[in-house]
Amino acid sequence: MSKRESSKYKIDRRMGENIWGRPKSPVNRREYGPGQHGQRRKGKLSDFGVQLRAKQKLKGYYGDLREKQFRAIFAEADRRKGDTSENLIGLLESRLDAIVYRAKFVPTVFAARQFVNHGHVSVNGVRVNIGSYRCKAGDVIEVREKSKQLVIVLEAVSLAERDVPDYIEVDHNKMVATFGRVPTLSDVPFPVVMEPHLVVEFYSR
């Protein structure tokens, strides 16, 4: 298991949930957190603890985003009109690395960020190597020609453990995806319950 894979599963163990729905997640085999004290019984969380956990889970799901980066995304969601929690999900799902992951071009969101950073993806015909790049409805995301036969791509496309959501149209033969619309919380196929309203409460304290 690579260092990055180990780090990813550490998030699962910390949360006590298989947040990406992966068959190899260690929480499928045990119900305690990482480290030598992981088997200690956990007490009931305070309201703050519940809010913090919701934030850490959402932040971890999108590739264990840095706090400064995640807080900036929240700040923009809060500035926009409408429901802040829905805005937050919409902004996170509009990230290029999230769309590459949702389109099943790669197996994990961590791999998606690295894949984008290494220049394997174009948006509307222009190479983009920034995972946090924000896509708009109608944008066309394509795996670059030289990258379409990479093993990581071919294996990801064949994975049956997750489906492409209906707000993204994908042609896996051409390795092209169209970001149809910005989704709402109910549209997003999270394997576990995400509670962005608790994230709003956390940052609104």
From Swiss-Prot:
Bias kind Basic and acidic residues: ranges: 1-16
Q: What Gene Ontology molecular function terms does this protein carry? A: rRNA binding; structural constituent of ribosome
Name the InterPro entries for this protein: Ribosomal_uS4, Ribosomal_uS4_bac-type, Ribosomal_uS4_CS, Ribosomal_uS4_N, S4_RNA-bd, S4_RNA-bd_sf
One of the GO BP terms on file: ribosomal small subunit biogenesis
Q: Which Gene3D superfamilies does the entry link to?
A: Ribosomal Protein S4 Delta 41, Chain A, domain 1, RNA-binding S4 domain
The S4 RNA-binding domain covers 94-157
Matching SUPFAM superfamilies:
Alpha-L RNA-binding motif (SSF55174)
Coiled-coil spans are none
Q: Keywords on this record?
A: Ribonucleoprotein, Ribosomal protein, RNA-binding, rRNA-binding
Question: A single Pfam family, by name?
Answer: Ribosomal_S4
Q: Respond yes or no to whether keyword rRNA-binding is given for this record.
A: yes
Parts of the chain that traverse the membrane: none
Question: Which PROSITE patterns does the entry link to?
Answer: RIBOSOMAL_S4, S4
What Gene Ontology cellular-component terms does the record carry? small ribosomal subunit
**Where do the record's region annotations for Disordered lie?**
1-46
Statement: the UniProt record of this protein carries the keyword Cell wall biogenesis/degradation = no
Q: What does this protein do?
A: One of the primary rRNA binding proteins, it binds directly to 16S rRNA where it nucleates assembly of the body of the 30S subunit.
Q: Which family does it belong to?
A: Belongs to the universal ribosomal protein uS4 family.
Subunit structure and binding partners:
Part of the 30S ribosomal subunit. Contacts protein S5. The interaction surface between S4 and S5 is involved in control of translational fidelity.
Name it: Small ribosomal subunit protein uS4
| Originating organism | Rhizobium johnstonii (strain DSM 114642 / LMG 32736 / 3841) (Rhizobium leguminosarum bv. viciae)
Query: Gene symbol?
Result: rpsD
